[in-house]
């Protein structure tokens, strides 16, 4: 009996809906045999690998022509999954792609689970776990810089760094083991405390340096979470729309019309800015609006950046002062909106430099982008073209654990503990790093990771 892991799977690999092309993908030992049953054209078993072949998809039971197609035939092992792959290129459309998928399933294929094609690439050694995760990052990338990080990870930059470090740790462990078991060998360098500590300090410094890229990598991957706050009707939603250059939030003259948290992305110098337009924070008896206010407070706590919008044409209110207070420990930019009207706000009572804007007149909006650029990019040296970045929360957590384990080794060596007693912590470091690439990852976690992928990938 063919196991579920190695039967033939099929799925639609293009987004459902109308389009020029739709693709139904098959992977597995029986891909060619199944496709041949429903394809009228060249014998797919005899065509050269990695070729496109013209023909028609036919229902073998009725003889009905389903569509005019081009079939890509790719023979293992030089494929994404390292299995035989068939890609049926149809005319785009929900009905035709679904019909062809159902034909493939009827003739012996199984509907693929989310991410199962990439999972097979991992199980068959085509990619490691970091590269598989990079595939999803490429799909989800919102800017060119985020995509570049994912492409470097797919190319193996992070894998190489982790694998090389694991190998060096393994060499150190082997050296310690030989010294313990065969002390009479003179041709092996003695694993003294000084020798081992020099190496483990190098490992710790390398991984700590990698951890320093985590904040920048997370920003490039996920964006700068930016909360737009202010009392009701100061122009928060209008500012959001202006930055997005389209109407996504409800903009009216009635206070309290944003009753929930609205999230949108805008591209700032190749980095995604996740704009969160919060409900105005104020006391209210409206239950729905109260929920929005609570979510706004939560968004404020979690934001990387806060844009506090004040009304320049009115004196500071108690609500304004409350917002100034609760946002004072955040990375904040204060915006004075409605500067096209006479200014009455007391700027002397504001704690920092402000940016005067008029969303209505589209004045000084570019200065907001300049300030964000200075805060996060130029001053922080955000992007280095050839650097390897940590951007995945799973990777960051595991590297932190590996550093902690190495710190335990180094502290033990400092206290004069015998090297052999510290083997456990050093071995644990080696195992933790293996979880990043998938060499030592529980099956349940692997299943969970790939379940986040879309069907057909």
From Swiss-Prot:
The cofactors required by this protein are: K(+)
User: Mind listing the GO molecular function terms for this protein?
Assistant: GTP binding; GTPase activity; metal ion binding
Where the protein is mainly located, per its record?
Answer: cytoplasm
Enzyme group, top EC level?
hydrolase
Keyword Protein biosynthesis present in the record's keywords: the answer is no
Q: Which residues bind K(+)?
A: 233, 252, 254, 257
The biological processes this protein is annotated with in GO are: tRNA methylation; tRNA wobble uridine modification
Which of this chain's residues are annotated to bind Mg(2+)? 237, 258
Q: Which residues bind (6S)-5-formyl-5,6,7,8-tetrahydrofolate?
A: 25, 87, 126, 457
EC number from the UniProt entry? 3.6.-.-
Cofactor remark: Binds 1 potassium ion per subunit.
Q: What InterPro entries does the entry give?
A: G_TrmE, GTP-bd, GTP-bd_TrmE_N, GTPase_MnmE, MnmE_dom2, MnmE_helical, P-loop_NTPase, Small_GTP-bd
**Any matching Pfam family:** MnmE_helical
Q: Which PROSITE patterns match?
A: G_TRME
* Quaternary context: Homodimer. Heterotetramer of two MnmE and two MnmG subunits.
Which PANTHER family does the record associate with it? TRNA MODIFICATION GTPASE GTPBP3 (PTHR42714), TRNA MODIFICATION GTPASE GTPBP3, MITOCHONDRIAL (PTHR42714:SF2)
According to its UniProt record, which protein family does this protein belong to? Belongs to the TRAFAC class TrmE-Era-EngA-EngB-Septin-like GTPase superfamily. TrmE GTPase family.
Role of this protein: Exhibits a very high intrinsic GTPase hydrolysis rate. Involved in the addition of a carboxymethylaminomethyl (cmnm) group at the wobble position (U34) of certain tRNAs, forming tRNA-cmnm(5)s(2)U34.
> Which protein, by its recorded name, is this?
tRNA modification GTPase MnmE
